[in-house]
């Protein structure tokens, strides 16, 4: 669905600029992983990207706020937080580092899959070898919950699950479906433990060369595409969960009481994020 949103964004840009501005989309990580593209934006070799906020922590530590487990309970809260002054403040932290944030899109609420057993309570996390993003908040969070957290690039994840190098992973439903993790994972626990945004960013070197009118076209197109992308992502997520059940994954939902027990285990992680974000 990210591809559909980029196409929508490109159409908005072309339309609003009267055909003077055109967006060429390059998908499937053809320009490298997020971290490589970030450096290309900072250096001015690439103009724009849509990527995970979690991979931007190395550029702007404030982005770690969005990795905080159990920070956001539902999409209404997510929209209010990301599109309000807090979201703007976190976005603004990118500018001194050479990037400009235009809008937050939605990746979705992350949920847990594994091959060992259903995770219904905190104790069930113990001993699960779980792939996490190469990000300290994710690493520290799952260690605190008792899992054996293994940082791995996303591109290596399917093979790691298939060969049982790791037992499980955590991602939004749409990613679990599109990456076919249901082929190599048996259990899905609805944890909604982290709300993951995407962010549309541009190279500051390039941005500073644009006219005020050109900047306005891009900014407004990013906001319009945000609304399109969120609606699309939420519709797809509902379908994806039904699809995963149909494909044979055993699905259980973490109770509120057990989610609260996990939240209590994460107080030190929350404190670390708070001091890092400021």
Regions found by a protein language model. Give the residues of each.
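N-terminal secretory/targeting leader peptides
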Residues: 1-77, 85-88, 92-278
């Amino acid at each position: 669905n990210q591809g559909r949103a980029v196409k929508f964004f490109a159409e908005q840009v072309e339309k609003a600029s009267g055909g003077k501005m055109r967006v060429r989309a390059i998908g499937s990580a053809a320009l490298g992983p997020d971290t490589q593209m970030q450096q290309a934006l900072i250096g001015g070799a690439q103009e724009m990207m849509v990527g995970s906020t979690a991979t931007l922590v190395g550029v702007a530590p404030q982005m770690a706020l969005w990795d905080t487990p159990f920070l956001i309970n539902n999409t209404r809260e997510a929209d209010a937080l990301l599109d309000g002054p807090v979201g703007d403040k976190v976005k603004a932290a990118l500018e001194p580092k050479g990037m400009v944030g235009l809008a937050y899109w939605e990746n979705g609420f992350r949920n847990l899959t594994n091959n060992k057993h259903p995770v219904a309570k905190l104790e069930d996390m113990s001993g699960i070898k779980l792939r996490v993003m190469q990000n300290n908040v994710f690493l520290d969070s799952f260690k605190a919950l008792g899992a054996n957290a293994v940082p791995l690039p996303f591109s290596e994840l399917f093979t790691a699950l298939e060969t049982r190098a790791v037992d499980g992973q955590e991602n939004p439903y749409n990613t679990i479906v599109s990456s076919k993790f249901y082929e190599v994972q048996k259990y899905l626990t609805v944890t909604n433990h982290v709300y993951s945004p995407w962010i549309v960013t541009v190279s500051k070197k390039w941005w500073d060369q644009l006219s005020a009118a050109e900047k306005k076209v891009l900014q407004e197109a990013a906001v319009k595409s945000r609304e399109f992308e969120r609606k699309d992502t939420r519709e797809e997520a509902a379908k994806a969960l039904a699809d995963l059940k149909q494909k044979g994954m055993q699905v259980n939902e973490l109770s509120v009481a057990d989610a609260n027990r996990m939240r209590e285990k994460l107080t030190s992680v929350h404190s670390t994020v708070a001091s890092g974000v400021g």
